[in-house]
């Protein structure tokens, strides 16, 4: 009889990383009844502790909230990449201690012992924890919560640096276009991921990616039909471990539990495909001037709207956006009254449930990868307005490479002083809400493919099976 095995997952902090990690764990234990998973949760100083509220999660998935690591007590940090590298490093002891508690005791019989430790599955940003896995003499795997195009881009840049001595940051202020093997079209420097905008972040990012070569495989939250070009490139002899596309990994259960909310009841009263939904992720927010441009657009667009509007943290402070105590303090005077019959402005939004509602006709999005997959799953076209991290690259892929989105401003950066005009926003909303557009047709087709990928015989189902076979 096969002995049970334990995998240790260490997601990066942040709800997007944790949610997709939990979905990955659920897929694995559903496929193999001898597999146990422990998720070690690292908490950012300004974030809430993680609590599992999903009663359907298997008893073979266990969560451990790690003690908070001792960090610099200052509210500001000069470089996010440096902060996160230090954050992960400072958790090594806590990860090690947690894993020791999972190990079988040597005097236990095989029939009563804990599952054998089979490996670590580390978040894409936490490759330095390979050192801890090596101490326990077990293999490491990477769980890449973004897309395979990002993985391919990072691997390509890492090779350019290490083998060709090329410094990508020297191009960031130019209007150059790059030949990147994982893309069909020339790739504009203006939409590079945010981690390549300065030398220190670039060094940290590429060093982290370089360590992927020490792992036994890379799980990616994508599916072959969506990213065939990038996945074929990664499978063509690139110096990288085997890549397993296993997505889309989405928490669809939570969307069903939100059915009774006021927001969804309001959507029930709207015609099919009539509402444009604006939402910019757990870290997305705008300054007052940009909020007023969006409000002006929505008031004059002629479309019904649902707008998730969050208040940015104080400038320079390490914190997440929050809900406004009073929306009238940031919106134009009288806006809420004038738009009361056609729109709703809310704080936090149950995004997955909203995107699954038949009234939603388009999604103005930051192009975070989880949000992108949710939108594709539900067949909702995107108007791309990226803000940070790899979202600019995601927008380029969706708009230019795949034709699954329209552009609002592909090269927008959250920390810039640029204010996107009402005219540009209105153009994007008008295009994304077109009922007979080619973009909408392509998204509908990709939606069907995303669902087929996960069922028996589908591309991601088969890929996950290959991963399980070699644990």
Curated annotation (Swiss-Prot):
It holds the Pfam family UDPGT. InterPro entries: UDP-glycosyltransf_plant, UDP_glucos_trans, UDP_glycos_trans_CS. It is an enzyme of class 2 (transferase). Gene3D superfamilies: Glycogen Phosphorylase B. Keywords: Glycosyltransferase, Transferase. Optimum pH is 6.75. Its EC number is 2.4.1.-. UDP-alpha-D-glucose binds at residues 282, 348-349, 366-374, 388-391. PROSITE patterns: UDPGT (PS00375). SUPFAM superfamilies: UDP-Glycosyltransferase/glycogen phosphorylase. GO terms for molecular function: UDP-glucosyltransferase activity. Optimum temperature is 30 degrees Celsius. The keyword Glycosyltransferase applies. It comes from the Eukaryota. Glycosyltransferase that possesses chalcone and flavonol 2'-O-glycosyltransferase activity. Converts phloretin to phlorizin (phloretin 2'-O-glucoside), a potent antioxidant. Possesses glycosyltransferase activity toward eriodictyol, apigenin, luteolin, kaempferol, quercetin, isoliquiritigenin, butein and caffeic acid. Belongs to the UDP-glycosyltransferase family. This is UDP-glycosyltransferase 71A16. It comes from Pyrus communis (Pear). The gene is UGT71A16.
